[in-house]
C-alpha cells in the first residue's frame, strides 16, 4: 500500500470513529479540540538539551530551547527505567506492573500490550480524534500487540530497541535462525473494520488491521533495501506530518505519537550530521545526533505553523527512560545519579518540555512532581472528557471493547495551566517488576542498591536509604560501606536517625496501592531478565506434576 493511500483506508475508520463520541465525549468542532503531538525521544540525556544545561555542554538545541521559552520546562518529571516500561507507562496511564510491560521487549516474546489495557489513542478516538503513531513502538511484536489494534488508525515503525534491528547484519549472526528468533521487519499498518482471520507465522492472527512488511532496517544504506538507520527518522517525521495534513483535511483533531530513533545506541548518522563533528566545535556523536533530534522538533513545529494550527496544538517533548550513559560518548548526560535501568534519579528523572499557547504559561518552570502516567487523564480533559479516570474505574465501552482499568495518572490540567500545584505526590520506581524505591513529596525511600548500574548486581539492603530530594537531588549522600561516620557522610548518619520515623508514610502508601491491585489485578506477569521467577514457576509446575503422578499411581 502506498503511503498516500491512507486516505482510502484510514479515513474510512476515522469517519466511523465519529460515532463513538460517547463515554463523556462531546461533538465540539475540531478546531475547539486541541491537536496533540507527543514527541518521545529515546534515551535522551537531560543535560544534552540546552534549556536544561544552560550552555554547559558543547551541543546546541535551538528548537527545543525555543519550545521551552514558549512553554513549560519540567524539573521533576519521571518516566521509567527502560524503554518498554516507559512507553507503556505513557500510552496506558498505568504502572507497568499492572500491564506486565516491565522490561525490554524481545523478538517473538509472548508478552506485549494486553487487549485489556486501554490506551490514550483508544480514548481519544472516542472523542473524534485521528490517531497516528510513527517510529519506535516496543510494546510487543505479534499482531495482537500492534498499535493499530490498540486505538491507532495508522502506524509505521519498528517494534524493538534500535540495536535489535541491527543484529541480523552482524557477520556472526546465524542467518538460518533469522525467521525463528530474529526481529520482525519494519511495519506499516492501518486499522480496519474487517476482522482478518489470516494467521501469519510467528506473528499470529491479523485481526482488524491491514499490515505491510516494509523490510529490514540495516545500519547503513544497502542495495535493494528501502530504509536504513542513517535516514529512517526522515521517513518517521515525514509520515507524521502527512498524517496531520490528512487529519486536518478530514476536519479531525489529531493525536500523533512521534518516536524517532535518536539517541538509542547504536547511533548511525547520515553524512549531513556526521559532518557536524569537527575540531572547531568539539562535538561527539551525541551532540551531532541531538542536532538531528532538534531539527526534527523544528520541522514539526514549523509544519504546525504552516498548517495554521500551532496555537491550538499541545506539543510535548520527552524521552522514554533515564539516559543511557554506559556507552558514552554514544550516550547521554544527566546530572542525576546513575542512569537508565536503575532506581536512582538518573534512571527515572528525564527532560520534558510542554508547549500549548494560551494555556501553558510561556517561559515557565514546573517544579512539581509529574509522571508520564499523567498525560492520559490530562489529554482526555483537554479533549473534552475530564471523567475518564472514573469511567475506567467503573467500566466503560470505547469502540468495540469494554475496559475496566485503574489509571495511575493524575489529571494535571491545573498544574500545567498555572492554576494550581501538581496533583501528584508519589513516584514508584520499578526495578522491572520490583518496587525499588518510592518518592513521597520531597522524600525518597530506596530499597535497592545498584552500584555498578543496570548491568550490575542489585543489592537489597536491610535498611533502606532516605533522601530529601530538595536538599540532595543528585543523591550524593549515603552510608559509607564500613558504616562509620566519615567526613561529609557524617551528616547522613545523624540525619537518617532522626528521619527514620518517616517510613510510616511508605507503609501507608504501599498499603493503599496494594488495595488497588486487589480490585484491579495485573493483566499478566511482568517480564524480567532475572530468572528467579521463572525458576520458581518451573519448580512449582514440577511439584504439581509429581503430585499428579503420585495421585495417578494410587
What are these regions (language model features)?
Residues 2-464, 469, 473-475, 480-554:
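Formylglycine-dependent sulfatase
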Amino acid at each position: 500500500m502506498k503511503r498516500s493511500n491512507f486516505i482510502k483506508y484510514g479515513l474510512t475508520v476515522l469517519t466511523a470513529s465519529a460515532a463513538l463520541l460517547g463515554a463523556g465525549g462531546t461533538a465540539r468542532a475540531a478546531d475547539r479540540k486541541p491537536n496533540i503531538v507527543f514527541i518521545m525521544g529515546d534515551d535522551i540525556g537531560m543535560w544534552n538539551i540546552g534549556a536544561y544545561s544552560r550552555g554547559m555542554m558543547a551541543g546546541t538545541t535551538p528548537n527545543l530551547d525555543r519550545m521551552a521559552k514558549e512553554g513549560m520546562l519540567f524539573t521533576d518529571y519521571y518516566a521509567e527505567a527502560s524503554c518498554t516500561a516507559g512507553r507503556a507507562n505513557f500510552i496506558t496511564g498505568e504502572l507497568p506492573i499492572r500491564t506486565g510491560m516491565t522490561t525490554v521487549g524481545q523478538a517473538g516474546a509472548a508478552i506485549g500490550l494486553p487487549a485489556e489495557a486501554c490506551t490514550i489513542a483508544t480514548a481519544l478516538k472516542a472523542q473524534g480524534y485521528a490517531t497516528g503513531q510513527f517510529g519506535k513502538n516496543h510494546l510487543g511484536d505479534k499482531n495482537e500487540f500492534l498499535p493499530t489494534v490498540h486505538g491507532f488508525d495508522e502506524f509505521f515503525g519498528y517494534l524493538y530497541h534500535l540495536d535489535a534491528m541491527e543484529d541480523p547484519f552482524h557477520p556472526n549472526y546465524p542467518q538460518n535462525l533469522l525467521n525463528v528468533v530474529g526481529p520482525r521487519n519494519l511495519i506499516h499498518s492501518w486499522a480496519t473494520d474487517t476482522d482478518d482471520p489470516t494467521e501469519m507465522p510467528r506473528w499470529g492472527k491479523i485481526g482488524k488491521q491491514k499490515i505491510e512488511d516494509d523490510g529490514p532496517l540495516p545500519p547503513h544504506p544497502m542495495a535493494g533495501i528501502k530504509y536504513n538507520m542513517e535516514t529512517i527518522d526522515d521517513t518517521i517525521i515525514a509520515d507524521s506530518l502527512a498524517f496531520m495534513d490528512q487529519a486536518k483535511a478530514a476536519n479531525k483533531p489529531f493525536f500523533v505519537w512521534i518516536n524517532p530513533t535518536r539517541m538509542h545506541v547504536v547511533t548511525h548518522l547520515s553524512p549531513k550530521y556526521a559532518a557536524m563533528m569537527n575540531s572547531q566545535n568539539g562535538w561527539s556523536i551525541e551532540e551531532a545526533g541531538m542536532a538531528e533530534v532538534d531539527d526534527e522538533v523544528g520541522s514539526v513545529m514549523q509544519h504546525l505553523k504552516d498548517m495554521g494550527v500551532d496555537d491550538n496544538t499541545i506539543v510535548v517533548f520527552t524521552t522514554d527512560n533515564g539516559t543511557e550513559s554506559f556507552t558514552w560518548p554514544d550516550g547521554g548526560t544527566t546530572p542525576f545519579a546513575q542512569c537508565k535501568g536503575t532506581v536512582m534519579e538518573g534512571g527515572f528523572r528525564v527532560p520534558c518540555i510542554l508547549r500549548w499557547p494560551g494555556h501553558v504559561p510561556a517561559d515557565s518552570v514546573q517544579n512539581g512532581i509529574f509522571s508520564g502516567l499523567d498525560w492520559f487523564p490530562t489529554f482526555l480533559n483537554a479533549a473534552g472528557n475530564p471523567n475518564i479516570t472514573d469511567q475506567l474505574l467503573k467500566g466503560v465501552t470505547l469502540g468495540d471493547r469494554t475496559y475496566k482499568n485503574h489509571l495511575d495518572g493524575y489529571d494535571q490540567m491545573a498544574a500545567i495551566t498555572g492554576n494550581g500545584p501538581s496533583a501528584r505526590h508519589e513516584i514508584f520506581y520499578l526495578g522491572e517488576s520490583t518496587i525499588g524505591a518510592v518518592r513521597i513529596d520531597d522524600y525518597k525511600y530506596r530499597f535497592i542498591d545498584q552500584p555498578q548500574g543496570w548491568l550490575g548486581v542489585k543489592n537489597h539492603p536491610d535498611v533502606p536509604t532516605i533522601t530529601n530530594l530538595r536538599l540532595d537531588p543528585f543523591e550524593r549522600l549515603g552510608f559509607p560501606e564500613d558504616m562509620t561516620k566519615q567526613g561529609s557522610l557524617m551528616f547522613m548518619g545523624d540525619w537518617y536517625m532522626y528521619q527514620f520515623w518517616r517510613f510510616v508514610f511508605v507503609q501507608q502508601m504501599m498499603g493503599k496501592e496494594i488495595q488497588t491491585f486487589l480490585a484491579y489485578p495485573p493483566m499478566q506477569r511482568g517480564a524480567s531478565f532475572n530468572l528467579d521467577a521463572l525458576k520458581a514457576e518451573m519448580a512449582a509446575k514440577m511439584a504439581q506434576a509429581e503430585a499428579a503422578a503420585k495421585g495417578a499411581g494410587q
